């Protein structure tokens, strides 16, 4: 089950949170969800070169707050803040409410699953060998603190006639452990041969809930009680037991008392 289910949806109630954080009644839910999907698609195209990892949309009291996580915040803001003002105006036109845009910097882009997937797809579109791109991304992630990473590519890899799937893993990726912080993302590379899909799982350690607090490993002793050696606790030895280490137990060897051929006892 842990291998098939979406890692983020599997951990929503334990260690992950929603990307859209708002409440709506049955009449408005579909329209607001469609707005969120349109906003994410627009930001993905508009900020294609800004290395955007994720987008969080909140709707407090007839307003909208959009938080963009990017490893290159300067590209999003633009010269003297011109680009972000144009972005805010377009988002207000699309959503119909006042929009506040916040930019958060991703400190380690090499361990962000979405940025890893986007980087691999960009290399595939530039005709770089998929194995080289995948292994380089895995090495960078492990070097910067990831405890495990798994990358899967599927499609007409290297332009072959028959599509296939290849994946590589390094370290641990416990998909069925709920407290494990698994960052999962997908991306698509549109090549001349067709579409190649890329999936990335990054294991960053265990957490204690949605605040991303790391788990402190405690040293646990053996729970089994040790028996105190007492003089009368040992069971008595039976005949033939004991002796020097390596000594054979039991009776005499078979044929030990018989004389050898051609020899008789005197």
From Swiss-Prot:
Indicate the family of this protein.
Answer: Belongs to the universal ribosomal protein uS3 family.
User: Which sequence ranges are marked TM in the entry?
Assistant: none
Keywords linked to the UniProt accession: Ribonucleoprotein, Ribosomal protein, RNA-binding, rRNA-binding
Top-level taxonomic group: Bacteria
Task of the protein: Binds the lower part of the 30S subunit head. Binds mRNA in the 70S ribosome, positioning it for translation.
Q: What is this protein called?
A: Small ribosomal subunit protein uS3
Set out the biological process GO terms recorded for this chain's protein: translation
Q: Which InterPro entries match?
A: KH_dom, KH_dom-like_a/b, KH_dom_type_2, KH_sf_prok-type, Ribosomal_S3_C_sf, Ribosomal_uS3_bac-typ, Ribosomal_uS3_C, Ribosomal_uS3_CS
Write out the ranges of the annotated region (Disordered).
214-266
- KH type-2 domain location is 39-107
Upper classification of the source organism reads: Bacteria, Pseudomonadati, Pseudomonadota, Betaproteobacteria, Burkholderiales
Annotated GO CC locations: cytosolic small ribosomal subunit
